Design a protein with these regions (language model features):
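Residues at alpha-helix boundaries and short interhelical turns
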Residues: 69, 87-90, 104, 121-124, ...
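Short Asp/Glu-rich motifs
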Residues: 119-120, 137
């Protein structure tokens, strides 16, 4: 006897702190773009496992850290580019190169960040970062 397939339950955000979550969602969309964020949330909508990650990312990364008053978004983007390049996190780096451009960084500033990465983190990490940024610049016509 075949078991009836249970209807998939929609996963919904379940933040611990609604204000941090709302602030985080606003900041996340401002930096990464609403389309990217909406796609990420939609991708987690049928997966409680992934929705938990989206909650934590939105609430703490974007609501608590990125929304703090101590550093402007442009500076936070500079830090992220250097850290992601050093860690060789290609997909996230691509996302944050786009975010950095959204936050007002210039191609020249991004180049200087990755040159600094070359000295302190190594040529291979910097080369990958340059390739990633170059692809983003071409996509965006920068």
């Amino acid at each position: 006897m075949a078991k009836a397939k249970a209807k998939a339950k929609k996963a919904k955000p379940n933040p611990r702190n609604k204000k941090l979550y709302d602030d985080g969602m606003k900041m996340r969309k401002a930096v990464l773009g609403a389309g990217y964020v909406d796609n990420s949330m939609a991708g987690a909508a049928n997966d409680d496992f992934m929705m938990s990650f989206q909650d934590v990312t939105t609430e703490y990364c974007w609501g608590y850290v990125w929304s703090r008053p101590g550093l402007p978004k442009k500076t936070r983007s500079m830090l992220n580019l250097a850290m992601l390049a050093a860690l060789n996190r290609g997909p996230e780096l691509k996302l944050h190169v786009n975010g950095a451009l959204n936050n007002g960084l210039t191609k020249e500033e991004i180049k200087e960040i990755f040159l600094q990465v070359a000295i302190y983190c190594g040529i291979p990490a910097s080369l990958d970062a340059f390739k990633t940024a170059s692809a983003v610049f071409k996509e965006r016509g920068v």
